[in-house]
């Protein structure tokens, strides 16, 4: 997955990553496979959780994705991740996936990560 950091907002406790969709991610209908979209969320959530965990690593304990619109090949998408709560035993996050060009909301997600 090709991703790069777009924004980091301390006050919002948010981080935004831009992903470029790739040919290997397409499904039989020609759109981006839901598993690839879930992978974008898990990647972005994981980076933020590991940074939040400090000296510890963090692992995914649960994650939920809601697919709202299709994602097409060649589309650049922005995934904005928010830290909902960072405790000692769990880091809770939520995220929103947008079309980078139109700013339309494509998917939402949430999940928890456990510092090890």
Residue ranges and their predicted role:
Residues 1-32:
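Catalytic strand-loop segment that frames the active site of acyl-thioester-processing enzymes
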Residues 5-7, 60, 83:
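A structural signal for short, hydrophobic beta-strand segments that form beta-sheets
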Residues 16-18, 80, 94:
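Beta-strand residues in well-ordered beta-sheet regions across diverse protein folds
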Residues 19-21, 67, 115:
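Hydrophobic residues in beta-strands and at strand termini
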Residues 32-55:
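Active-site helix/loop of acyl-thioester processing domains in fatty-acid/polyketide metabolism
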Residues 47-77:
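Hydrophobic beta-strand-centered segment that forms part of the acyl-chain substrate-binding groove
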Residues 71-73, 82-116:
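HotDog/MaoC-like acyl-thioester-processing domains
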């Amino acid at each position: 997955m090709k991703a790069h950091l777009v924004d980091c907002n301390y006050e919002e406790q948010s981080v935004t990553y831009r992903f470029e969709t790739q040919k290997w991610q397409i499904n039989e209908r020609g759109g981006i496979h839901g598993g690839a979209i879930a992978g974008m969320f898990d990647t972005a959530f994981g980076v933020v959780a590991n940074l939040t965990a400090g000296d510890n690593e963090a692992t995914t304990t649960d994650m939920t994705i809601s697919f709202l619109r299709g994602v097409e090949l060649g589309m650049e998408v922005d995934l904005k991740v928010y830290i909902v709560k960072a405790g000692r035993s769990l880091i809770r996050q939520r995220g929103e996936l947008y079309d980078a060009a139109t700013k339309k909301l494509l998917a939402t997600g949430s999940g928890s990560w456990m510092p090890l």
